Amino acid sequence: MTEPRWKQRYRAPSLTLPRWAPDDPEHLVYVSNLSGSWQVHAWDRAADRHRQVSDHPTGVVAGGLTPDGTRVVWFEDSKGDEVGRWLQQPFEGGEAAPLVADAEPAWSAGLALGPKGLVAVGLATRDGFSVRVGEVGGGSEELYRHDEMVDVGGLSRDGRLLVVHHAEHGDNLHPALRAFELEPMAPLADLWDGEGFGLFVASAGFSPVAGDGRVAVLADRSGRLRPAIWDPAAGRRVDLELALPGEVDVADWWPDAEALLLVHTYMGRDELSRLDLRSGALERLDHRAGSIQRAGVRPDGA
Protein backbone atom coordinates (compact mmCIF):
# COMPACT_ATOMS: atom_id res chain seq x y z
CA MET A 1 0.00 0.00 0.00
CA THR A 2 1.36 3.37 -0.99
CA GLU A 3 1.81 5.83 1.85
CA PRO A 4 -0.43 8.92 1.51
CA ARG A 5 1.31 11.90 -0.04
CA TRP A 6 0.73 14.08 3.02
CA LYS A 7 2.67 11.58 5.11
CA GLN A 8 5.43 11.42 2.51
CA ARG A 9 5.68 15.19 2.61
CA TYR A 10 6.08 15.30 6.38
CA ARG A 11 8.54 12.39 6.45
CA ALA A 12 10.67 13.55 3.53
CA PRO A 13 14.27 14.39 4.50
CA SER A 14 15.05 18.08 4.99
CA LEU A 15 18.29 20.00 4.68
CA THR A 16 19.58 23.50 5.23
CA LEU A 17 20.96 25.70 2.48
CA PRO A 18 24.54 24.49 1.84
CA ARG A 19 27.23 26.94 2.96
CA TRP A 20 30.41 27.14 0.92
CA ALA A 21 33.97 27.99 1.93
CA PRO A 22 34.88 31.51 0.73
CA ASP A 23 38.28 30.39 -0.59
CA ASP A 24 37.04 27.06 -1.99
CA PRO A 25 33.36 27.33 -2.95
CA GLU A 26 33.33 23.75 -4.25
CA HIS A 27 33.55 22.62 -0.61
CA LEU A 28 30.22 22.99 1.20
CA VAL A 29 28.48 21.86 4.38
CA TYR A 30 24.82 21.48 5.25
CA VAL A 31 22.70 19.97 8.01
CA SER A 32 20.18 17.25 7.13
CA ASN A 33 17.91 14.73 8.86
CA LEU A 34 18.40 12.17 6.09
CA SER A 35 19.77 9.67 8.64
CA GLY A 36 16.78 10.11 10.96
CA SER A 37 18.35 12.85 13.09
CA TRP A 38 19.89 16.21 12.22
CA GLN A 39 23.58 15.76 11.39
CA VAL A 40 26.29 17.77 9.60
CA HIS A 41 27.19 16.69 6.06
CA ALA A 42 30.07 17.67 3.77
CA TRP A 43 29.60 18.10 0.02
CA ASP A 44 32.45 18.06 -2.48
CA ARG A 45 30.63 19.69 -5.37
CA ALA A 46 33.41 19.14 -7.91
CA ALA A 47 33.53 15.41 -7.18
CA ASP A 48 29.74 15.17 -6.63
CA ARG A 49 30.38 13.44 -3.30
CA HIS A 50 28.40 13.77 -0.05
CA ARG A 51 29.57 12.56 3.35
CA GLN A 52 27.89 12.52 6.76
CA VAL A 53 30.32 14.13 9.20
CA SER A 54 28.68 14.01 12.63
CA ASP A 55 26.92 11.03 14.19
CA HIS A 56 25.57 12.13 17.54
CA PRO A 57 22.56 10.42 19.17
CA THR A 58 20.76 13.68 19.96
CA GLY A 59 21.67 15.31 16.65
CA VAL A 60 23.82 18.25 15.57
CA VAL A 61 22.35 21.47 14.17
CA ALA A 62 25.35 23.85 14.01
CA GLY A 63 28.15 23.33 11.50
CA GLY A 64 30.47 25.25 9.22
CA LEU A 65 33.73 25.34 7.27
CA THR A 66 37.05 27.05 7.70
CA PRO A 67 37.42 29.77 5.02
CA ASP A 68 39.92 27.67 3.06
CA GLY A 69 37.50 24.72 3.00
CA THR A 70 39.97 22.26 4.48
CA ARG A 71 38.09 21.57 7.74
CA VAL A 72 34.51 21.01 8.83
CA VAL A 73 33.49 22.31 12.27
CA TRP A 74 30.41 21.54 14.38
CA PHE A 75 29.11 21.95 17.91
CA GLU A 76 28.45 18.72 19.78
CA ASP A 77 26.95 18.43 23.25
CA SER A 78 27.61 15.20 25.12
CA LYS A 79 24.29 14.81 26.95
CA GLY A 80 21.78 16.73 24.88
CA ASP A 81 21.79 19.61 27.39
CA GLU A 82 23.49 22.03 24.94
CA VAL A 83 26.72 22.06 26.97
CA GLY A 84 29.49 20.86 24.70
CA ARG A 85 32.49 21.71 22.53
CA TRP A 86 33.21 22.78 18.99
CA LEU A 87 34.90 19.97 17.06
CA GLN A 88 36.78 19.95 13.76
CA GLN A 89 37.71 17.33 11.19
CA PRO A 90 39.48 17.35 7.80
CA PHE A 91 37.00 17.93 4.96
CA GLU A 92 37.83 14.57 3.39
CA GLY A 93 37.26 12.76 6.70
CA GLY A 94 39.39 11.55 9.58
CA GLU A 95 39.62 11.88 13.32
CA ALA A 96 37.57 14.58 15.03
CA ALA A 97 39.39 16.85 17.47
CA PRO A 98 38.53 19.93 19.56
CA LEU A 99 38.39 23.10 17.49
CA VAL A 100 40.20 24.95 20.28
CA ALA A 101 42.28 22.71 22.51
CA ASP A 102 41.91 24.66 25.76
CA ALA A 103 38.22 25.66 25.53
CA GLU A 104 36.20 24.14 28.36
CA PRO A 105 32.80 22.51 27.74
CA ALA A 106 30.20 25.29 27.70
CA TRP A 107 27.06 26.59 26.10
CA SER A 108 27.92 28.00 22.69
CA ALA A 109 28.00 31.81 22.53
CA GLY A 110 28.91 32.14 18.87
CA LEU A 111 31.76 31.21 16.57
CA ALA A 112 33.72 33.03 13.86
CA LEU A 113 36.37 31.51 11.59
CA GLY A 114 39.05 33.58 9.87
CA PRO A 115 42.05 33.20 7.57
CA LYS A 116 45.08 31.04 8.38
CA GLY A 117 43.23 29.00 10.99
CA LEU A 118 42.06 31.97 13.06
CA VAL A 119 39.11 31.20 15.33
CA ALA A 120 37.05 33.26 17.80
CA VAL A 121 34.75 31.27 20.05
CA GLY A 122 32.16 32.46 22.56
CA LEU A 123 31.63 30.41 25.72
CA ALA A 124 28.84 30.63 28.31
CA THR A 125 29.19 28.93 31.70
CA ARG A 126 27.67 29.36 35.15
CA ASP A 127 30.60 31.69 35.87
CA GLY A 128 29.80 34.10 33.04
CA PHE A 129 30.53 34.71 29.37
CA SER A 130 33.86 34.86 27.56
CA VAL A 131 35.38 35.15 24.10
CA ARG A 132 38.59 33.32 23.27
CA VAL A 133 40.76 33.82 20.17
CA GLY A 134 43.24 31.25 18.87
CA GLU A 135 44.07 28.84 16.06
CA VAL A 136 42.15 25.82 14.82
CA GLY A 137 43.42 22.80 16.74
CA GLY A 138 45.68 24.93 18.93
CA GLY A 139 45.50 27.02 22.05
CA SER A 140 43.63 30.27 22.62
CA GLU A 141 43.74 33.48 24.62
CA GLU A 142 40.87 35.13 26.46
CA LEU A 143 39.89 38.40 24.77
CA TYR A 144 36.81 39.39 26.74
CA ARG A 145 34.86 38.27 29.83
CA HIS A 146 31.75 39.58 31.55
CA ASP A 147 28.95 38.40 33.83
CA GLU A 148 26.36 39.66 31.35
CA MET A 149 25.65 38.12 27.96
CA VAL A 150 28.25 38.19 25.20
CA ASP A 151 28.01 36.51 21.80
CA VAL A 152 30.48 36.38 18.91
CA GLY A 153 29.14 38.33 15.92
CA GLY A 154 31.77 37.93 13.20
CA LEU A 155 35.35 38.30 11.94
CA SER A 156 36.49 40.56 9.13
CA ARG A 157 37.70 38.85 5.96
CA ASP A 158 41.36 39.57 6.77
CA GLY A 159 40.99 38.58 10.43
CA ARG A 160 41.89 42.02 11.79
CA LEU A 161 38.55 42.86 13.40
CA LEU A 162 36.09 40.98 15.58
CA VAL A 163 32.60 42.20 16.51
CA VAL A 164 30.64 40.84 19.47
CA HIS A 165 27.17 41.43 20.90
CA HIS A 166 27.18 42.29 24.59
CA ALA A 167 24.77 43.25 27.37
CA GLU A 168 27.06 45.12 29.75
CA HIS A 169 24.16 47.55 30.21
CA GLY A 170 22.06 44.68 31.59
CA ASP A 171 19.55 44.04 28.78
CA ASN A 172 20.05 40.72 26.97
CA LEU A 173 17.15 41.39 24.61
CA HIS A 174 18.65 44.65 23.33
CA PRO A 175 22.41 44.09 22.96
CA ALA A 176 25.06 46.58 21.94
CA LEU A 177 28.04 45.93 19.65
CA ARG A 178 31.74 46.15 20.37
CA ALA A 179 34.55 45.85 17.85
CA PHE A 180 38.01 44.57 18.77
CA GLU A 181 41.29 44.76 16.95
CA LEU A 182 42.94 41.35 17.19
CA GLU A 183 46.38 42.88 16.91
CA PRO A 184 46.97 43.99 19.65
CA MET A 185 43.80 42.32 21.12
CA ALA A 186 42.17 45.57 22.21
CA PRO A 187 38.72 47.24 21.99
CA LEU A 188 38.34 49.50 18.96
CA ALA A 189 34.80 50.91 18.94
CA ASP A 190 31.33 50.60 20.47
CA LEU A 191 27.90 50.95 18.92
CA TRP A 192 24.76 51.33 21.07
CA ASP A 193 21.43 52.98 20.36
CA GLY A 194 20.54 53.47 24.01
CA GLU A 195 18.28 51.83 26.55
CA GLY A 196 15.54 49.69 25.06
CA PHE A 197 17.07 49.43 21.59
CA GLY A 198 19.10 46.54 20.18
CA LEU A 199 21.84 46.14 17.59
CA PHE A 200 22.70 42.88 15.89
CA VAL A 201 25.26 41.69 13.35
CA ALA A 202 23.24 40.81 10.24
CA SER A 203 23.42 37.37 8.64
CA ALA A 204 25.81 38.79 6.03
CA GLY A 205 28.39 39.87 8.62
CA PHE A 206 31.53 41.59 7.39
CA SER A 207 32.33 42.62 3.84
CA PRO A 208 33.85 39.73 1.84
CA VAL A 209 36.70 41.96 0.63
CA ALA A 210 39.97 41.71 2.57
CA GLY A 211 40.90 45.07 4.06
CA ASP A 212 37.29 46.28 4.08
CA GLY A 213 36.26 46.57 7.72
CA ARG A 214 32.58 47.34 7.14
CA VAL A 215 30.01 45.08 8.76
CA ALA A 216 26.28 44.81 8.05
CA VAL A 217 24.21 45.32 11.21
CA LEU A 218 20.52 45.50 12.14
CA ALA A 219 18.91 48.12 14.39
CA ASP A 220 15.42 48.14 15.89
CA ARG A 221 15.14 51.77 16.97
CA SER A 222 12.51 52.42 14.28
CA GLY A 223 10.30 49.69 15.72
CA ARG A 224 11.34 47.21 13.02
CA LEU A 225 14.69 45.62 12.24
CA ARG A 226 16.43 47.78 9.66
CA PRO A 227 19.92 47.44 8.14
CA ALA A 228 22.92 49.70 8.51
CA ILE A 229 26.59 49.56 7.56
CA TRP A 230 29.06 50.09 10.39
CA ASP A 231 32.74 50.85 9.86
CA PRO A 232 34.28 50.55 13.36
CA ALA A 233 37.74 51.74 12.35
CA ALA A 234 36.38 54.88 10.69
CA GLY A 235 33.78 55.47 13.39
CA ARG A 236 31.08 55.70 10.75
CA ARG A 237 27.56 54.27 10.58
CA VAL A 238 25.23 54.55 7.58
CA ASP A 239 21.57 53.62 8.09
CA LEU A 240 20.05 52.29 4.88
CA GLU A 241 16.78 54.04 4.07
CA LEU A 242 14.41 51.59 2.38
CA ALA A 243 10.84 52.05 1.18
CA LEU A 244 9.79 48.64 2.52
CA PRO A 245 7.03 48.12 5.10
CA GLY A 246 8.38 45.05 6.91
CA GLU A 247 11.53 43.95 8.68
CA VAL A 248 14.72 43.56 6.66
CA ASP A 249 17.76 41.33 7.13
CA VAL A 250 20.99 41.45 5.15
CA ALA A 251 21.49 37.89 3.92
CA ASP A 252 24.78 38.41 2.11
CA TRP A 253 27.14 40.77 0.29
CA TRP A 254 27.90 40.59 -3.40
CA PRO A 255 31.54 39.46 -3.85
CA ASP A 256 32.77 42.97 -4.73
CA ALA A 257 31.00 44.42 -1.63
CA GLU A 258 29.17 46.95 -3.82
CA ALA A 259 25.70 45.47 -3.23
CA LEU A 260 23.71 43.65 -0.55
CA LEU A 261 21.25 40.77 -0.73
CA LEU A 262 18.25 41.75 1.41
CA VAL A 263 15.44 39.61 2.82
CA HIS A 264 12.26 41.61 3.38
CA THR A 265 9.65 39.95 5.62
CA TYR A 266 6.07 41.21 5.34
CA MET A 267 2.60 39.67 5.61
CA GLY A 268 4.04 36.21 6.25
CA ARG A 269 6.18 36.19 3.11
CA ASP A 270 9.86 36.80 2.40
CA GLU A 271 11.16 38.73 -0.61
CA LEU A 272 14.72 38.95 -1.93
CA SER A 273 16.16 42.18 -3.30
CA ARG A 274 19.53 43.49 -4.43
CA LEU A 275 20.55 46.86 -2.99
CA ASP A 276 23.24 48.75 -4.88
CA LEU A 277 25.27 50.60 -2.24
CA ARG A 278 26.56 53.20 -4.69
CA SER A 279 23.33 54.25 -6.38
CA GLY A 280 20.85 53.16 -3.72
CA ALA A 281 18.84 51.28 -6.36
CA LEU A 282 16.73 48.44 -4.99
CA GLU A 283 15.99 45.59 -7.41
CA ARG A 284 13.43 42.92 -6.54
CA LEU A 285 14.70 39.44 -7.45
CA ASP A 286 12.42 36.93 -9.13
CA HIS A 287 11.62 33.86 -7.01
CA ARG A 288 8.68 31.81 -5.80
CA ALA A 289 6.53 33.20 -2.99
CA GLY A 290 7.09 31.73 0.46
CA SER A 291 9.40 31.76 3.45
CA ILE A 292 13.18 32.00 3.10
CA GLN A 293 15.31 30.48 5.84
CA ARG A 294 18.63 31.45 4.30
CA ALA A 295 20.00 32.95 1.08
CA GLY A 296 23.48 33.68 -0.24
CA VAL A 297 25.46 35.03 -3.18
CA ARG A 298 27.98 32.66 -4.75
CA PRO A 299 31.53 33.94 -5.46
CA ASP A 300 30.63 34.28 -9.15
CA GLY A 301 27.74 36.59 -8.22
CA ALA A 302 24.97 34.02 -8.77
Q: What spans do the regions from the language model cover?
A:
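Peripheral, non-catalytic segments that deliver or gate enzyme domains
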Residues: T2-A302
